[in-house]
């Protein structure tokens, strides 16, 4: 029998403590939802739950529609990674970790318009030269579950793009609440 992982006991309330190192590595924060699966071999599997990933195809279509109408690149992310990309290279963004700047914007629950950005991190650890960007957090039932990002490397954005990102975030939030 191979021994991998860490052994933990279940307390009298049925709780299991997930070690801090694992939580940090997987970016599991206090209050984050986890899915519990049981496979055929009797193994219990914990998976980080992303409510917005249920909207994966829908988010992709919405990103495509925004790109078609505005002509700027569009990204949609959950709390950890980008789940939809339109107008930019998918290999540069899709399933890549979001930056700390994006996490902070989601935690503040308010949209941002930066019209004279220089160097910005959208993907964790990768600086990009940008002219402007706007971010709208997707807040469902009071909790930030993702964000919509519209950015341009050569054009300046204004209130139209800012309102579009807020509208998209609000619409996706309402879809999640239903």
UniProtKB/Swiss-Prot annotation:
Q: Which organism is it from?
A: Bacillus subtilis (strain 168)
Q: Which UniProt keyword terms apply here?
A: Activator, DNA-binding, Repressor, Sporulation, Transcription, Transcription regulation
The record, for Pfam families, names: MazE_antitoxin (PF04014), SpoVT_C (PF15714)
Give the region (GAF-like) as residue ranges.
Answer: 56-178
Domain SpoVT-AbrB stretches: 5-51
What top-level branch of life does the organism fall under?
Bacteria
Domain free text: The N-terminal domain binds DNA non-specifically and the C-terminal GAF-like domain is crucial to its correct folding and function. The non-specific DNA-binding activity of the N-terminal domain is modulated by the C-terminal domain, which perhaps in combination with another unknown factor, confers activity and specificity.
A GO molecular-function annotation: identical protein binding
The annotated subunit structure for this chain is:
Homotetramer. Two monomers dimerize via their N-terminal swapped-hairpin domains. These dimers further associate into tetramers through helical interactions between their C-terminal GAF-like domains.
From the Swiss-Prot or TrEMBL record, give the protein name: Stage V sporulation protein T
Q: What does this protein do?
A: Transcriptional factor that positively regulates or negatively the expression of a large number of forespore-specific sigma G-dependent genes. May provide a mechanism of feedback control that is important for forespore development. SpoVT levels during spore formation have a major impact on the germination and the resistance of the resultant spores.
Tell me the protein family, please. To B.subtilis AbrB and Abh.
PROSITE patterns associated with the record: SPOVT_ABRB
UniProt cross-references to NCBIfam families, sorted A to Z: lp_hng_hel_AbrB, spore_V_T
| Expression induction or repression | Expression is regulated by the sporulation transcription factor sigma G.
Name one process (GO BP) from the record: sporulation resulting in formation of a cellular spore
Q: What happens when the gene is disrupted?
A: Deletion of the gene leads to aberrantly formed spores. Mutant spores release their dipicolinic acid (DPA) via germinant receptor (GR)-dependent germination more rapidly than wild-type spores. Spores are also more sensitive to UV radiation and outgrow slowly.
